């Protein structure tokens, strides 16, 4: 069973990203959207935490672009139709609100 974890809040405002990383399974994936895209800023603790985990990571392309975030090679930028496909592909979707 796999879960798509969706984060939309800045990793610098609360501990949701760290909580998610503690619970995420090997078959799960993480999608960053909205201000959660700031987790991909190089040189930050969230960037390092995501990079070292080796997890399946997606970011909404338009949210990364709107925040001038370059998507690293270990993450995949997706559009909204791909977000829907990811939601269908996984058994569950967990939105960290």
Give the residues covered by each predicted segment.
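Structural motif corresponding to alpha-helix initiation and N-cap regions
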Residues: 14, 43-44, 77-80
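Short, glycine-rich nucleotide/cofactor-binding loops
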Residues: 3-16, 34-39
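C-terminal structural segments of small proteins and small subunits
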Residues: 67-97
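Short internal beta-strands
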Residues: 29-34, 56-62
């Amino acid at each position: 069973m796999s879960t798509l974890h969706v984060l939309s809040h800045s990793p610098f405002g609360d501990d949701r990203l760290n909580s998610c990383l503690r619970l995420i399974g090997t078959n799960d994936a993480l999608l960053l959207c909205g201000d959660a895209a700031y987790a991909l800023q190089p040189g930050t603790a969230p960037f390092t935490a995501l990079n070292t985990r080796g997890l399946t990571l997606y970011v909404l392309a338009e949210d990364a672009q709107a925040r001038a975030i370059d998507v690293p090679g270990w993450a995949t930028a997706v559009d909204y139709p791909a977000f829907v496909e990811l939601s269908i592909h996984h058994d569950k979707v967990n939105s960290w609100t």
